[in-house]
């Protein structure tokens, strides 16, 4: 089985299982395309993950005003009055990660968070992931790119085809080959999932 097949199976499982769980969130691959709800306001996009927790979030101007005041310093005042279609790529990333922070899950699964991002956006994404970690939220980076993943991780989990999991602590990252594919590193066909707990 190819690494991408295993990765796809993990992603599909996460997307179906975490939908019902407030304590878990998924940041999808290419989130500025897949997680922005066009036609909705910036505030509606930001509050999307709260609808299960706060039943009347859409009509409660008091709660929405409080959220705006709390997040203005992080997001900027101007974005709240912009159409989501007019946001910059950076502002879209900020919106998505702020939505997750507002949800306040215990764990966030990030599917290929750096895929397709240029250097400036990679740095911005890395800082946003650090913000989640600083809030005590566990971040699991589901990727095939070890270089990006290991910069944030405090351990590496190798999942073998038979489901066996091998953990590599941060102090042993220097021995992990960075070249692709890593078949020589694996005993069987595996995929890697990194996370910081």
Give residue spans per PLM region.
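ABC ATPase nucleotide-binding domain signature region
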Residues: 1-54
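Hydrophobic anchor residue at the start of the ABC signature
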Residues: 97
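ABC-family nucleotide-binding domains
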Residues: 111, 117-118
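Conserved H-loop
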Residues: 136-142
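A short, surface-exposed alpha-helical micro-motif characterized by mixed small hydrophobic
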Residues: 149-151
């Amino acid at each position: 089985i190819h690494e991408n097949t295993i990765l796809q199976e993990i992603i599909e499982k996460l997307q179906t299982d975490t939908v019902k769980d407030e304590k878990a969130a998924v940041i999808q691959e290419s989130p500025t395309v897949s997680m922005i709800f066009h036609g909705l306001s910036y505030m509606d996009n930001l509050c999307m993950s709260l609808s299960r927790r706060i039943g009347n979030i859409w009509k409660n101007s008091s709660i929405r005003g409080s959220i705006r005041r709390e997040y203005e310093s992080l997001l900027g005042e101007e974005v709240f009055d912009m159409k989501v279609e007019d946001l910059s790529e950076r502002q879209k990333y900020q919106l998505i990660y702020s939505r997750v922070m507002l949800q306040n899950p215990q764990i966030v699964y990030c599917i290929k968070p750096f895929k397709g991002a240029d250097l400036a956006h990679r740095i911005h994404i890395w800082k946003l992931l650090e913000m989640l970690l600083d809030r005590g939220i566990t971040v699991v980076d589901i990727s095939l790119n070890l270089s990006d993943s290991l910069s944030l991780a405090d351990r590496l989990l190798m999942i073998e085809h038979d489901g066996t999991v091998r953990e590599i602590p941060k102090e042993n990252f220097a021995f992990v080959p960075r070249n692709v594919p890593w078949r020589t590193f694996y005993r069987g066909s595996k995929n890697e999932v990194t996370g910081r707990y």
